[in-house]
C-alpha cells in the first residue's frame, strides 16, 4: 500500500516536471512489422507552392501505423488525373501508388486532390478532393492517409484524430490539443499549478482533467470549442482520475471524501457522487469498458497494485492482471480486445498489452519509465509517454510492439498523452 501511495504521488507531482514546450515534432519510426504493405506516395503536383508538403505528411502517417513501408519516389510529382506507368512502379517494389495535386483557389483556399492506385492489378482504387484553408492543409493530408489506410487494410484510419498532452515550462502548465502525429498543437488551457489526467469525452467535444489550482486536486471538464469549463468534483480531500462512460453521461472519479481513495460515479454535469464499492483498499485510475458494462481500475486490495474489473453498478471485483507484482494505468482498446497498462519490471516501468480473451501478455517496450498509455480510436496504436535519452518523450507503438514512432522535438518534454475519438467530417 505504501509503495502505491508513493507511485501515485510521483505521478501527480514529480512526474510533471518538464522542459520547454515543443512547437513541432520530428517523427522517427523504428522497428519492422510482420507484414508491411509497400506504398509509393509521389510528390503532389503544385505542393512546392504551398506551406505543407502533403505527400510527406501522408507517407509519415502510413509508416507510423506499422502497416506500410514507404517506397522511394525519387522526387516524382504525379497528379491525380494522369494514369501512372504501373509496370514502372511495380519494378520499384510498390504494391500501391498515391498521386495528387494541390492548387490555390480564387477565394484563397486550397484545392487538394488525390488518387490511389493498385499497381499490381493496374486498378484505380478511388480518390477524393478537399477545399481547405491554409490552416487545414495538414488535416487534408491526414484525411488522405485515412482513406488509403481504410481502403488497403479494411480498418478505419485514425490519422485525422487528435491527441492531448501536458507540458510545463517556466512554472506554467499547459494542456495542448494536437494532430495525431503531434503537430499543429493548440493550447487548450494554462495554469501555474499542475494539470493532470486529461480524458476525452466520447464525442470529442470535452476534455475532463484534474487541476491543482485550489492547492488540491479538483476535477473539471473543458469544452474544446468554446474554452469554457465546468467544475465537476471538488469534495473534501482529493478528487482525481476522471474517466468518461461510453455514452458521455457519467464520469468515474477517484475521491477521498470518505477516507482513502475510492471510486465514485458522478453525472457529467456535476452533482452528488455515487460510491461504486465498499472496501478499505486504495482504488484508483478507473476506465470504462467500451460496452459500458464494466469498469477497470487499479487497487491494492491484494497487497500490491493490480488491475481489477467490476460492474458499473458496483459490487464484486475480479482481478485481471496476474503477470508481474505491480501493474497500474489501465487503458482499454475501443474494440474491447486489449488492455494496455504499465508494469514494474526489475524497478523499471514498462508498457505491456494484455489480450483480454486469451490472457496473453506482450511486453511492448524496452524503455524504463513508461506511463499514461492511451489507444487510438481504431485500436491499432497506443500513445504513451516515456523517458528516452535523458528526457521525457511522446511515443506511439503498435499493439504488438513491433513498430514504434518517437514524436521528438529539439527542446522540451511532454506528459500525460490521451488519444481522442473519431471526428465527424
Swiss-Prot record:
HAMAP family: TolB (MF_00671). GO terms for cellular component: periplasmic space. The keyword Cell division applies. Keywords: Cell cycle, Cell division, Periplasm, Signal. This is Tol-Pal system protein TolB. GO terms for biological process: cell division; protein import. It comes from Albidiferax ferrireducens (strain ATCC BAA-621 / DSM 15236 / T118) (Rhodoferax ferrireducens). PANTHER family: PROTEIN TOLB, PROTEIN TOLB HOMOLOG. Part of the Tol-Pal system, which plays a role in outer membrane invagination during cell division and is important for maintaining outer membrane integrity. Residues 1-23 form the signal peptide. Its main location: periplasm.
